[in-house]
Amino acid sequence: MSSNIHANHLSLDASSSSSSSSSSSSSSSSSSSSVHEPKMDALIIPVTMEVPCDSRGQRMWWAFLASSMVTFFGGLFIILLWRTLKYLWTVCCHCGGKTKEAQKINNGASQADGTLKPVDEKEEVVAAEVGWMTSVKDWAGVMISAQTLTGRVLVVLVFALSIGALVIYFIDSSNPIESCQNFYKDFTLQIDMAFNVFFLLYFGLRFIAANDKLWFWLEVNSVVDFFTVPPVFVSVYLNRSWLGLRFLRALRLIQFSEILQFLNILKTSNSIKLVNLLSIFISTWLTAAGFIHLVENSGDPWENFQNNQALTYWECVYLLMVTMSTVGYGDVYAKTTLGRLFMVFFILGGLAMFASYVPEIIELIGNRKKYGGSYSAVSGRKHIVVCGHITLESVSNFLKDFLHKDRDDVNVEIVFLHNISPNLELEALFKRHFTQVEFYQGSVLNPHDLARVKIESADACLILANKYCADPDAEDASNIMRVISIKNYHPKIRIITQMLQYHNKAHLLNIPSWNWKEGDDAICLAELKLGFIAQSCLAQGLSTMLANLFSMRSFIKIEEDTWQKYYLEGVSNEMYTEYLSSAFVGLSFPTVCELCFVKLKLLMIAIEYKSANRESRILINPGNHLKIQEGTLGFFIASDAKEVKRAFFYCKACHDDITDPKRIKKCGCKRLEDEQPSTLSPKKKQRNGGMRNSPSSSPKLMRHDPLLIPGNDQIDNMDSNVKKYDSTGMFHWCAPKEIEKVILTRSEAAMTVLSGHVVVCIFGDVSSALIGLRNLVMPLRASNFHYHELKHIVFVGSIEYLKREWETLHNFPKVSILPGTPLSRADLRAVNINLCDMCVILSANQNNIDDTSLQDKECILASLNIKSMQFDDSIGVLQANSQGFTPPGMDRSSPDNSPVHGMLRQPSITTGVNIPIITELVNDTNVQFLDQDDDDDPDTELYLTQPFACGTAFAVSVLDSLMSATYFNDNILTLIRTLVTGGATPELEALIAEENALRGGYSTPQTLANRDRCRVAQLALLDGPFADLGDGGCYGDLFCKALKTYNMLCFGIYRLRDAHLSTPSQCTKRYVITNPPYEFELVPTDLIFCLMQFDHNAGQSRASLSHSSHSSQSSSKKSSSVHSIPSTANRQNRPKSRESRDKQKYVQEERL
C-alpha cells in the first residue's frame, strides 16, 4: 500500500490540477512550496494493479460529500414531508370524524349490532399497531438510556469507539487527503468500517427512541454521523479514501463529562464544571484544526486546487492555538481563501472562548482542594480528629495545651477537619507543628470525608464550639449534628464535644450510640463557667485555683520576693492520676494523703473507689473510714507527670528511709513487678474495660452514722416545709413558686436588711440568649450545706429576661429578684451590696457586638460603678440592734474544738473597692480595665493578670484546656464537675432532660446519704485552733493537723497581695497560692482552702464547721440569712422570734 503512494507530503489537490495538462509541460511547476514536488508527468492518485482505481487521477471528493449531503437533506425532507402529510391527515380525519359522528347519531337507532363489529375490529387492529410501535420505542429508549446498566454500557462503548475513530483519523491524516485504498488490505479502513457500522446501528436506536424526529435530525451528534458514516461506505464502493470531514468525531469529546458522571467518577460540581470546560475547549480546538487541515491541503475549488500547501494535522493544531491566543507568530498561516475566511470567524469565537474558558479552567485547577487526600495512619501511633470551630485562636489554644511539655506521653497525631481552607496564619501554625498536626478540608457531615480522616481507627473525635457566636443554641445544634453524623458512621468512636448551653446537653442523650460510660463527654461551658463562679461565692479565689489546676502551665521562676513569685509557683501545678502502690493497701485515706504530702511531695485529693459489684466512683477526701484497695487510682496535684510516678513506685521496704523524693524510683522488688496495675497506663482509664466512674462523690459503703438513720431526732427535727431535697438528694428543693412572689420592689428590698447574701447583677433583655442561671444556683443549693447555711441569692436585672430563666429556678429556696439595672446605685444600695458575701456580674448580651473590645462594656462599667461607691458604717448599726448577724462559727456557744472558733466579726465596708466581686469577661484582653491600680500589660495572658490571680475576674476561655485534659483522662472532667456543680450526675441530667426542672423527693436513707460528701471551705488563721500556726508556722504542719484532727484536706492559700511586705499595707486584695510546699511560711491573715467533711450536727445549731466566703479584706464569715431577725441561743426558737416582728417585715421575709 505504501509503495503505491508516490509522496506522503505531496499535496494531492495541486498535483491533480497539474495532471490535466500535457505530460510534456514538465517545466511548469505547482504553486506548492514543497521541496518534494513531483514532476508533472507523475500520477497523483496512486495506482496498483490490484485496486481498480481511476488511473486518470480524477478527483472524487464530491462523491463523498454528496453522500453526506443527500443523507442529511434527504432525511430532513422525508421528515418534513411526513409531518406535512400527518398534519393534513389529521385535519381531514378530524372533519370526517365529525360527519361520521353526526351520521352515527342520526342512524344509530336503525343500525343493527352486527354492522358495528367491523369498526370495532379495525379499532383493535390500530390499537395493536400503536402498542407495538410504543413497545419498540420504549425498548430503544431503554437501550440508549444511562439509567440502566445496558444503556450505560452502550453509551460508554459509543464514546470509546468515537475516540477510536478519531485516533484512526489522526493516523490517516499523515496520508494525502484523497487516495486509492484496498478495503481488503487496509487494516485501518476495516476497523473504521466496523466502528461506523456500530454508529449506524446506534443512530437507528436513537432515531427510534426520539420523540421529536426533526430536532433529533438537527442534533450535533446526528450531524457528526451524517458527515462521517456515509463516506466510509462510499470509500468501500469506490476503493478510494477521502479524509474529508472525519475530524467532526472530535465533537464527541463534549460528552466526556457525561460519561464520567455515568461511571460515578465525577461527583463534585467543580470537577464536573472543569471537565466540561476542558472537553468543550479541546473538541472545538481539534475540530477547527481538522477543517484547516482539509482546506489548506486541498486548496480552493475555484482556484482549481492549485493554491494548496502541505500542512500536517498537528501543525494545524498549533496554528489554531496561536490564533486563539492572539499571538500569531507567522511561521504557519493559512494560504487558501477558505482557510483565511474560516480564520476570520474563528478568531472572533476562538478568542472569546480562549479568554473566558482558559482563566476559568486555571481557576478551577488552582482552587482544587489543597488539603484533599486521605490520612495515612502511622503504625504504633494513635490519632485524633478535631473538628467544629477551627480558627487560629481555637487551634492555637488547643495545641498549646494538648502538646504541652509537661505531658510526657503525647504520642498522638492531631488531624483537623474543616470545610474551609485555613488562612495564612493558621496554615503557618500547622506548618510549625507539621510533625504532629495535619489538616484536611472537608466536613464531618460527609461520610466520604470521615473515611478520608480514618475516623473508624481514630482514638477520639474532639468537637470545638464557637464560644463567641451570636446564637448559642444554633452553635450547639451544629455540634449535635456533627455528633450524630460521626456516631452514625462509627458508633464506637469516642467523642468529646463542647456545648454552650446546659439545656442542649439533653439532646445528646437522644443519640442511641452516645454512652458516657464508654468515654463520650460533653463539656458544657455555661455549666462549668457558672459553676466556677458559684464556688467563688463560697470561697473567693477558688475559680482561679481550679482553672489553673486543669490547665497546663509552664513554671516561670521569679527571683524577687513578690506576690507573682508565689502565685506562679502554684500555677505550675496540674491535676494528674496515677495508680497507688501496693504499699498503701489497707491504710486509711488521710494516712495515705499525709504520707504522700510529707514524703512524696504529692497532694492527693481523691481516689477512684470500686465497690463490691465493681462499680467505680470518684471519692473526694472520703475520710478515715475508707481503706485503700489494691490498684486504686489516685488524683494528685503536682507540677508534672513524672512526680506523680512516685506514688506508683513507692515501696516501704526500699524507700522508707529516703528523704529526697526525687530518689523514689522503680525498685527491684518482685512485689512491684507482679503488680497488676503496672500493666495499665495511668492515662488509660476505664475505657480499657469496666465501668466508667460516676460523678457522684458519695461512696456506696457510707459510714454508719446514726444521724443518717430514719426516725432519728435529726429527721424528726427537720421542718418538712423547708428542709426538702430533690429526688436525688443532691440539692435543696422547694415547691415551685410564682415569680411574682419573689419580686422585691426597691423600697421592700431596702426595708429588708440583707447580709451575707449573694448579689447577681445580670445584663440581659427579652431577646438575649439564655445563659442558664440554674447552673449558678445549683452549687449554692447543694445538699451538703444545711438550710441555715444557704446564702440568699438576689438577682438584679431585667424582669423580662429573668422571667425566661425562672422556669429553671422556681424550685430553689432563698431566691429573690429586684427588677432594675446593675448600673443603678439605688438598686445596688437597696440590696445592701456592701454587706454581701459576693457580687457576681454576668451579661447575656456579650456576643451581639462586632467589636470584641466592647463585648464586656456592661460588665466593666458595673464593676467600676460598684468599686466607686461609698457606704456608711452599716456593720456597727446592725451589731448594735441585732445579734442575728453573728456569722456561723463566731457564736460563743460554738464548741471549743471548732476550727473557726473565736473569729472576729466582719469589719465595716465603707468603700466599694472592698466589696468582693467576680466579673465574667468574654474578651480576655478586657481584664486590663477592671483594676485601675494594676500594671498588667494588654498583651499579658489572662492567668498572669492581677484580677484573675485575685479571683475577681473569670473568662470562659480558660475552659478550653478541659478538652485536652478530658481526652488524656476523662476522670478529670468528672472530678471538676463534682467539685463545681455541687453534685450533678448523669442521672440528674437525664431527669432534667425529661422535665426541665428538679423533682422533689422524700428524705429517705438513700437520699440523705448523698448529703454526706465533702465541700470546699475557707478557713482563717487569725483565731481558732489553727491560730498558733498562723504566725510564722509551716503550711505542712497545718496540713497534717487539719487532716488528723478534722479530716480536712488543705490544698491552697488565699493571701493578701502585700503580705510579703515588711511595712503594713492598706491593700485588701488577695491572690491564690496552689499547693504550697511543706515548709511554706504562714501569716495570720491567710485564708486556707480546704475540703471539709459534712457536719451532721450543724443542722441543730448555728455553731458549725461551715464554709465561708470572705471579702477581699475579710478574715471572718458572714451569716447567709436576713439579719434583721433577732436570734436566741437556740436555733429552734427562730420561728417564734419572727412572729414578734412587725407585719410588714414578716411579709417581706416570707417573700425571701
Swiss-Prot record:
Residues 15-34, 1102-1127 have a biased composition (Low complexity). Residues 381-523, 755-899 form the RCK N-terminal domain. Phosphorylated. Phosphorylation by kinases such as PKA and/or PKG. In smooth muscles, phosphorylation affects its activity. Palmitoylation by ZDHHC22 and ZDHHC23 within the intracellular linker between the S0 and S1 transmembrane domains regulates localization to the plasma membrane. Depalmitoylated by LYPLA1 and LYPLAL1, leading to retard exit from the trans-Golgi network. Residues 82-152, 210-213, 260-274, 363-1152 are cytoplasmic. Residues 1-37, 675-703, 1102-1152 are annotated as: Disordered. A motif (Selectivity for potassium) lies at residues 326-329. Gene3D superfamilies: 1.10.287.70, NAD(P)-binding Rossmann-like Domain (3.40.50.720). It is a multi-pass membrane protein. It is found in: Cell membrane. Residues 587-607 are annotated as: Segment S8. GO terms for biological process: positive regulation of membrane hyperpolarization; potassium ion transmembrane transport; regulation of membrane potential; relaxation of vascular associated smooth muscle; vasodilation. Residues 948-968 are annotated as: Segment S10. Homotetramer; which constitutes the calcium-activated potassium channel. Interacts with beta subunits KCNMB1, KCNMB2, KCNMB3 and KCNMB4. Interacts with gamma subunits LRRC26, LRRC38, LRRC52 and LRRC55. Beta and gamma subunits are accessory, and modulate its activity. Interacts with RAB11B. This is Calcium-activated potassium channel subunit alpha-1.
